[in-house]
Swiss-Prot record:
Compartments (UniProt record): Cell membrane
Main localization (coarse): membrane
NCBIfam families (alphabetical): lepA, small_GTP
Residues holding GTP: 22-27, 139-142
Domain spans labelled tr-type G: 10-192
Keywords: Cell membrane, GTP-binding, Hydrolase, Membrane, Nucleotide-binding, Protein biosynthesis
Domain of life: Bacteria
InterPro entries tied to this protein: EF-4, EFG_III/V, EFG_V-like, EFTu-like_2, G_TR_CS, LepA_C_sf, LepA_CTD, LepA_IV
Enzyme class: hydrolase
Membrane topology, as annotated: Peripheral membrane protein
GO biological process: positive regulation of translation
Protein name in the entry: Elongation factor 4
CDD domains referenced in this protein's UniProt entry, alphabetically: EF4_II (cd03699), EF4_III (cd16260), LepA (cd01890), lepA_C (cd03709)
Organism: Thermobifida fusca (strain YX)
């Protein structure tokens, strides 16, 4: 078997699998591991490459992995196939683009019973932009509901090949997998690079290991990377000593060096993944390369949410937990904030809703924390009339005074749906201030619709609405596309004239009344009755737009006046009224924790279900 150091690039094939969740990507990877014999039968477990429990449980891949598979093809030559596993979710599209940049080809894996989905389509377009060779494959042909002929024609139409070029496999039974491996060798071009030039390697993932610090996964483009040499990160200029170089097959195996086209891992003893960023170029510190590999960018958070421990004493635990998660997740940002209502917590920035959902899940599961998260927010840019600019990630930072313009982020969304549901989807998108950019029929019963939508309208419960209006058949993909000016206002919720910061929200002027009315009504049901009347108001600035009252609890002061005189009764009632008035002046409304939790969770219920969304 060719050694990693001395493998002829002509024998290497780097490929990834593009697939929607549940279309069988991990199962296909499992079959490949078994067929090439790198995992013994007795060590095999389902979803071998998905390491995190949450990945196995939700059936999604969050971090990329890379496995080296030796495969003897029909011509009796042993080729090295590097399978680079990619995340399939829209929040992680930058990670996907870096994984694709490390490959020369991609397997487009589609469920033969369901057809292609919006995210798969988005990742396919990304693969075509990277000039990858696409091998279309229909999986699950053993299912009784499979319609391979129909979907082969659909795939052929999208990629521009013949329906007969579409391979058919069943990852579950293993049928057609060997033929697929032979096709990979035949169709995907070998990597090209300058073996004698300065070393350049692309980082496509980095993982934090408790014992050894950060493990960085790389694909060598030019030159070679040798153990024990000093390397330099080209985006930051930082240099590190290399402690170990290796390949994964599928357990880490040490080697002396990695040559052109090889995929492997490096360990430098760095303790923080933010120093080894996905998409960065690694070069030798002694003879650095001049050109950076294209496509690197810093991950920017799109959605912000406050995370607060339900038990205030857990604050330091939450801080440590976030720092630990950040070791493995360079896109997560957080800063401490306090809220009069919820106490101490953190304002966290995420790539999208699934990222938020998964981070919250991991905090609760791995660190045993009970958390409240405030409604997700996007980043607004507010320009005042005096020319100053504010960046707002939290409604409480919203400036008061004369505002010239507010700009909000927008996304280009693609919805794939059966053609019967075009009406309800248009209605939903227009209700969310969407603008239709165009629509295309992929086949007679499937439509691709393209919309420009404000990100703020998607982060709430857009996905749930989309699924419920299309009986779960539509799929959504979106990518950021700049910002637009919008007529937005901040709605405050006041309890007895005091603003409760946790419930403030920035909404479009047209939706302000419905948000205010809904929140006041909800709080009226959740806050227990006090000894005095409590007004709940929703206000924009100083203008109240909705109000509900919590009626006072009253003691029956007339119980002991049996027949008695009316003036006696009136005296007692007046006295009670006087007492209530005094109470109202000095009384404070205690909002129970449960009321916060249920008001915030119903308000951001979009998130709760959204994690399972795809």
């Amino acid at each position: 078997m060719p050694q990693p150091t001395r493998t002829d690039p002509a024998l290497i094939r780097n490929f990834c699998i593009i697939a929607h969740i549940d279309h069988g990507k991990s199962t296909l990877a499992d079959r490949m591991l078994q067929l090439t014999g790198v995992v013994e039968e007795r060590q095999m477990r389902a979803q071998y490459l998905d390491r995190m429990d949450i990945e196995r449980e939700r059936g999604i891949t969050i971090k990329s992995q890379a496995v080296r598979l030796p495969f003897t093809a029909l011509d009796d030559v042993t080729y090295i196939l590097n399978l680079i596993d990619t995340p399939g979710h829209v929040d992680f599209s930058y990670e996907v683009s870096r994984s694709l940049a490390a490959c020369e080809g991609a397997i487009l894996l589609v469920d033969a019973a369901q057809g292609i989905e919006a995210q798969t389509l988005a990742n396919l377009y990304m693969a075509l932009e990277h000039d990858l060779t696409i091998i279309p494959v229909l999986n699950k042909i053993d299912l009784p509901a499979a319609q391979p002929e129909k979907y082969a024609a659909e795939l052929a139409g999208i990629i521009g090949c013949e329906p007969s070029d579409v391979l058919r496999v069943s990852a579950k039974t293993g049928e057609g997998v060997e033929e697929l491996l032979n096709e990979i060798v035949a169709r995907i071009p070998p990597p090209v690079g300058n073996a004698d030039g300065p070393a350049r390697a692309l980082i496509f993932d980095s993982v934090y290991d408790t014992y050894r610090g950060v493990v960085t996964y790389v694909r060598v483009v030019d030159g070679q990377i040798t153990n024990r040499e000093r390397i330099q990160m080209m985006s930051t200029g930082a240099t590190h000593e290399m402690l170990e170089v290796g390949v994964i097959s599928p357990e880490p195996t040490k080697v002396d060096s990695l040559g052109v086209g090889e995929v492997g891992y490096l360990i430098t003893g760095v303790k923080d993944v933010r120093q080894s960023r996905v998409g960065d170029t690694i070069t030798s510190a002694a003879a650095p390369a001049a050109e950076v590999l294209p496509g690197y960018r810093d991950p920017k958070p799109m959605v912000f949410s406050g995370l607060y421990p339900i038990d205030g004493t857990d604050y330091p635990v939450l801080r440590d937990a976030l720092e630990k998660l950040q070791l493995n997740d360079a896109a997560l940002v957080f800063e401490p904030e306090t809220s009069a209502a919820l106490g101490f917590g953190f304002r966290c920035g995420f790539l999208g809703l699934l990222h938020l959902e998964i981070t919250r899940d991991r905090l609760e599961r791995e660190f045993d924390l009970a958390l409240i998260s405030t409604a997700p927010n996007v980043v607004y840019r507010v320009r005042m009339e005096d020319g100053t600019e504010h960046t707002v990630t939290n409604p409480s930072e919203f400036p008061s005074g004369k505002i010239a313009e507010i700009r909000e982020p927008v996304v280009k969304a693609t919805v794939l749906t059966p053609s019967d549901y075009v009406g309800p989807i248009m209605e939903l998108c227009q209700g969310r201030r969407g603008v239709l950019d165009g629509m295309e029929y992929l086949s007679e019963d499937r439509v691709e619709m393209r919309y420009t939508l404000p990100l703020a309208e998607i982060v709430f419960d857009f996905f749930d609405q989309l699924k419920s209006r299309t009986k779960g058949y539509a799929s959504l993909d979106y990518e950021p596309s700049g910002e637009q000016a919008a007529d937005l206002v901040k709605v405050d919720i006041l309890l007895q004239g005091q603003v409760v910061d946790a419930f403030s929200a920035i909404v479009h002027r047209d939706n302000a009344y419905s948000y205010g009315a809904e929140m006041t009504k909800k709080l009226r049901e959740l806050i227990p009755r006090q000894q005095f009347e409590v007004p709940i108001q929703a206000a924009i600035g100083s203008r109240v737009i909705a109000r509900e009252n919590i009626r006072a609890l009253r003691k029956d002061v007339l119980a002991k006046c049996y027949g008695g005189d009316i003036s006696r009764k009136r005296k007692l009632l007046e006295k009670q009224k006087e007492g209530k008035k005094r109470m109202k002046m000095v009384g404070r409304v205690e909002v129970p924790q449960e009321a916060f939790i249920s008001a915030l969770s119903t308000e951001s219920s979009g998130e709760g279900k959204d994690g399972k969304k795809k």
